[in-house]
């Protein structure tokens, strides 16, 4: 496995990209907002989306942080398109959905991402947790994103153990034939 050193932002100039990381609190939300701001500064029209947000009420705190970092608001935030699935219990998406008593609507998630892609040059879709987090009882987040052919932005950290987690995650993406846009 080799790691390229390139201008990551340039690889993200168009399309839908899925932002994942080594685990919860790896820095995905900050990286998503920062990348969006960098792309905005380069003249791209950018939207961010939180695929599933758990442990929240009627809004996504991650989307709010994206907007603060980007220095913009988006009308799609008010329409619920940028945070289509919100769950109250702080857990993996599949467990939070079960506790809240409603399933995750995968078709709706895809529709929201595609609707954003119609209006913006770049859509950064932030996942919850790491690649192997169950989105539903039968579907891992990584497999959902791969099925959409979304390239990945992978976020790691400097904390102890992160090299191991990063290598295992990157190998999982490689085994699935996933495109990697950036490693941060």
Residue ranges and their predicted role:
Residues 115-121:
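Glycine-rich phosphate-binding loop signature in dinucleotide/nucleotide-binding domains
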Residues 14-18, 46-47, 122-124, 151:
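Residue-level preference for the first positions of well-ordered beta-strands
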Residues 21-28, 156-161:
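Short, glycine-rich nucleotide/cofactor-binding loops
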Residues 12, 16, 30-103, 107, ...:
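N-terminal phosphate/diphosphate-binding loop that engages ATP/GTP or pyrophosphate donors
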Residues 24-26, 53, 129:
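Short, glycine/acidic-enriched loop or turn micro-motifs at the edges of active sites
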Residues 1-21, 25:
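Extreme N-terminal, non-catalytic leader segments
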Residues 122, 127-184:
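Conserved catalytic-core segment of NTP-binding enzymes
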Residues 27, 31, 105-108, 136-137, ...:
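Short secondary-structure boundary/capping elements
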């Amino acid at each position: 496995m080799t790691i390229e050193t390139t201008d990551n932002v340039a690889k993200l100039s168009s399309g839908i990209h899925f932002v994942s990381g080594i685990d919860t609190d790896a820095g995905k939300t900050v990286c998503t907002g920062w990348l969006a701001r960098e792309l905005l500064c380069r003249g791209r029209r950018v939207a961010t989306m939180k695929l599933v947000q758990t442990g929240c009420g009627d809004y996504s705190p991650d989307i709010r942080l994206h907007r603060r970092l980007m220095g913009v608001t988006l009308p799609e935030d008010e329409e619920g398109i940028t945070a289509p699935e919100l769950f109250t219990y702080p857990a993996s998406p599949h467990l939070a959905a079960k506790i809240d008593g409603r399933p995750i609507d995968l078709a709706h998630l895809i529709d929201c991402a595609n609707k954003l892609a119609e209006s913006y040059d770049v859509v950064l879709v932030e996942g919850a947790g790491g690649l192997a987090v169950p989105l539903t009882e039968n579907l891992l987040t990584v497999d959902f994103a791969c099925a959409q052919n979304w390239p990945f932005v992978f976020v790691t950290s400097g904390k102890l153990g992160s090299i191991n987690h990063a290598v295992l995650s990157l190998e999982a993406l490689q085994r699935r034939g996933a495109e990697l846009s950036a490693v941060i």
